[in-house]
Amino acid sequence: MIPGPELLPDVLPTDRLTQTGRPAVELRAELRRSHNLRNVVNIVSVWAQSFGLIALACWLTTQLAWSALVVWPVTFVLMGRVFALYAILGHEAAHRLLFSDKRVNDLVGGWAVAYPGFVPLAAYRRGHMAHHRDEFGPNEPDLNLYENYPITRASLWRKLRRDASGSSGWKNLKGLLNAFRSDTARPFAIRIAAAQVVVAAALLAIGGWGRWWLWPALWLAPWMTVWRVLNRLRGIAEHGGLMRSEDRRLTTHTVRQSLWARFWIVPFNTGWHLAHHVDSGVPFQQLPNLHGELVAAGWVTPGVEYPNYRSLWRALASAEATERLPQEEN
């Protein structure tokens, strides 16, 4: 799965890109400009989708009782997708790209997107910066998600079944609960718990006491199940099967983007992931433009691009049974 040297031409630097692919000074100023107002709209949109979806489900099942057999399962699955929206905007906040003012970025990014999505923003930021400094390195916090690929098809399905069943989600939830016992981690856990109280209260206002179960069934449970599946599929598509290198083309996959993938797995342009790893200071709104610059320079070639995510997942699950490594706990 690692691209050969014939697919990795040495064409940098150019007048617009540096040796590593980062934008040169003039282009950098253009690509790194802030998008404060647009991100206010993005945050409002995510909240509207979250609570609007559940409100619509409550209304439909009240008006048409027979629709519950379809409406609630569809809402459950779609709420798993909602956590991708929270996660990516929280990721922007971790890079301090959500708002140009750092205090506003951390305050709004924490309380409006990270904590509702069960993410401790400051702790996540520390780990995520280690990921960007040295993918696949000794301090890589996400290595257990995508190391040792390709694996067998059966192994991938076992991982996805654990995600879908809530087994993986329970590990994450247990870690959050255990954080209350730690003096250093407790402040993060309290903030997340406080945000969940607000979410639960909002859902109670939407559904009434007769639907007290909305938070555990349509917020917590999708986060523990559907979101785990989507997060794994996205994570392995970003870095699975690659290697530690200073050349980001060897650490990060390139996949042609589609509306389907952008809706379910890679919202807010996060699918242009190679561009993000080339320059993590570029806001998500500009990642397609940076990717276009990398292609125009000849640094990203058609040979390293997967036509869609399905083809990449097939490659990641293409190992023979005799080649499978004992990593079933991940």
What are these regions (language model features)?
Residues 89-108, 141-145:
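Aspartate-rich (DDxxD/NDxxD/DxxxD) Mg2+/diphosphate-binding motifs
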Residues 1-79, 114-217, 284-330:
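Non-catalytic, topology-defining segments of multipass membrane proteins
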Residues 86-95, 124-136, 234-241, 266-282:
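Histidine-centered catalytic micro-motifs
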Residues 59-64, 93-101, 131, 180, ...:
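Membrane-interface elements of multi-pass transporters and channels
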